[in-house]
């Protein structure tokens, strides 16, 4: 892709946007940057981009007339149904995201693409660790926080790019083709962005739309939505399941993880897996399938599964104070993720939940919570919505708080020896925090300040 002298409109000045601008500049593109935030809110970012000469900014509003551009690159947080984006699309402008741009500019590394409503980051990190320990030139990139485009100068055909992909990123691909794709699960999420469940599923399925019979697609057999996508996939499908025996896949049999892709192999007892919970067992089986089809040594895979400590903000142990365990699951940004979190523990749970409203339904979460959760501590935009739903389910011990400091303090005061205080909000963080990472850090800081 030759971008020298081309006019490129970049929409969205987040982390991927900054990296994209720097690479577009190196390639000689003429850059127009648009962000809905104004100059004052973007001051630090603008300072970082001072060295770039051929750049124009349209800030605080979306552009009205940019007909003379050659290409549009959208950051993941930018909806593709914005009026000016639709106008550009209808006029025939080429619109892609950072992942697609990086794919086109790359030196043909091996892409592994991993998506799903939940478990993406853990599985991506797990696969990255497996390939790293196998001495492969490995990059862990994508939605996990490392822009894919930052690898284009250092990666080669021998490199492996383990890429976490959100539905937002998958909306804006065109020719992106991973050697191995994986869809871990699909449950209701981001309907404020995609509007319908069908559109959300369609975005997730984009991960395999360019794959051929020479590629592999790893799918969760236990997830009916995911399983139904197999008929649309041209790649060789490898299933994983913890409830059924699957031919040509990875499954659980008498507490043993079985690999049955070429020959049947009794691989590892599930109790030897270091990560807790049934959902993490599924993540591990997906990682096994990915690594196996890439011909990683089985002993390396086994060693990683037995020692991997997990990822920050994903059911992360914070502290044991007076025999009360504090757990940070700030990445639990939808009800299904929080259901999986509370089902991982056999102690009474004080659940801290609430955040930005994404249009989620909390009925199933609170129905499940009746068997696990003794108290609810609620904050953020959705606090009253969750409270009303909880009362309808018979919850009585509900506490509405104004911020994380009060949430932790209240949880501490009502806790008893043997309890778990679990931050798993079931909501996005953006009503109160810049990111789920900042929210998780605030929780940990407040927990560690308890005397």
Swiss-Prot record:
It catalyses: UDP-N-acetyl-alpha-D-muramoyl-L-alanine + D-glutamate + ATP = UDP-N-acetyl-alpha-D-muramoyl-L-alanyl-D-glutamate + ADP + phosphate + H(+). GO terms for biological process: cell division; cell wall organization; peptidoglycan biosynthetic process; regulation of cell shape. It comes from the Bacteria. The keyword S-adenosyl-L-methionine does not apply. HAMAP family: MurD (MF_00639). Its EC number is 6.3.2.9. This is UDP-N-acetylmuramoylalanine--D-glutamate ligase. Cell wall formation. Catalyzes the addition of glutamate to the nucleotide precursor UDP-N-acetylmuramoyl-L-alanine (UMA). GO terms for molecular function: ATP binding; UDP-N-acetylmuramoylalanine-D-glutamate ligase activity. Keywords: ATP-binding, Cell cycle, Cell division, Cell shape, Cell wall biogenesis/degradation, Cytoplasm, Ligase, Nucleotide-binding, Peptidoglycan synthesis. ATP binds at residues 116-122. Pathway: Cell wall biogenesis; peptidoglycan biosynthesis. It is an enzyme of class 6 (ligase). Signal peptide: none annotated. GO terms for cellular component: cytoplasm. Belongs to the MurCDEF family. The lineage of its organism: Bacteria, Bacillati, Bacillota, Clostridia, Peptostreptococcales. Its main location: cytoplasm. It is found in: Cytoplasm.
């Amino acid at each position: 892709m030759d971008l020298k002298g081309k006019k490129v409109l970049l929409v969205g000045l987040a982390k991927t946007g900054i990296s994209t601008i720097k690479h577009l500049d190196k390639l000689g593109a003429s850059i127009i940057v648009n962000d809905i935030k104004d100059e004052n809110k973007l001051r630090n970012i603008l300072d970082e981009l001072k060295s770039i000469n051929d750049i124009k900014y349209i800030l605080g509003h979306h552009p009205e007339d940019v007909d003379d551009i050659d290409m549009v690159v959208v950051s993941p947080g930018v909806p593709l149904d914005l009026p000016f984006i639709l106008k550009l699309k209808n006029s025939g402008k080429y619109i892609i995201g950072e992942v697609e741009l990086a794919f086109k500019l790359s030196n043909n590394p091996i892409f592994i693409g991993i998506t799903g409503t939940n478990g993406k980051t853990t599985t991506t990190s797990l696969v990255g660790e497996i390939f790293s320990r196998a001495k492969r030139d490995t990059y862990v990139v994508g939605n996990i926080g490392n822009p894919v485009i930052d690898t284009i100068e250092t990666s080669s055909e021998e490199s492996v790019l383990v890429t976490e992909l959100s539905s937002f990123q998958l909306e804006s691909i065109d020719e992106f083709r991973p050697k191995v794709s994986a869809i871990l699960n699909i449950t209701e999420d981001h309907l404020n962005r995609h509007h319908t469940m069908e559109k959300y599923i369609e975005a997730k399925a984009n991960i395999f739309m360019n794959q051929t019979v020479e590629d592999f697609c790893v799918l969760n057999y236990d997830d009916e939505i995911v399983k139904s996508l197999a008929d649309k996939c041209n790649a060789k499908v490898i299933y994983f399941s913890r409830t059924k025996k699957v031919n040509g896949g990875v499954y659980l049999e008498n507490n043993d993880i079985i690999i049955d892709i070429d020959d049947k192999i009794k691989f590892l007892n599930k109790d030897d897996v270091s990560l807790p919970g049934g959902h993490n067992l599924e993540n591990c089986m997906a990682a096994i399938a990915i690594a196996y089809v890439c011909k990683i040594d089985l002993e390396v895979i086994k060693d990683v599964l037995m020692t991997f400590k997990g990822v920050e903000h994903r059911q992360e142990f914070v502290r044991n104070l007076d025999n009360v365990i504090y757990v940070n699951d700030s990445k639990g940004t939808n009800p299904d993720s929080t259901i999986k979190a509370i089902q991982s523990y056999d102690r009474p749970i004080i659940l801290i939940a609430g955040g930005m409203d994404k249009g989620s339904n909390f009925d199933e979460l609170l129905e499940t919570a009746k068997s696990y959760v003794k108290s609810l501590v609620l904050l953020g935009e959705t606090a009253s919505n969750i409270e009303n739903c909880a009362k309808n389910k018979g919850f009585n011990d509900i506490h509405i708080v104004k911020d994380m400091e009060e949430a932790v303090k209240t949880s501490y005061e009502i806790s008893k020896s043997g309890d778990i205080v679990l931050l798993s909000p079931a909501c996005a963080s953006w009503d109160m925090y810049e990111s789920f990472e900042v929210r998780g850090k605030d929780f940990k800081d407040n927990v560690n300040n308890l005397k």
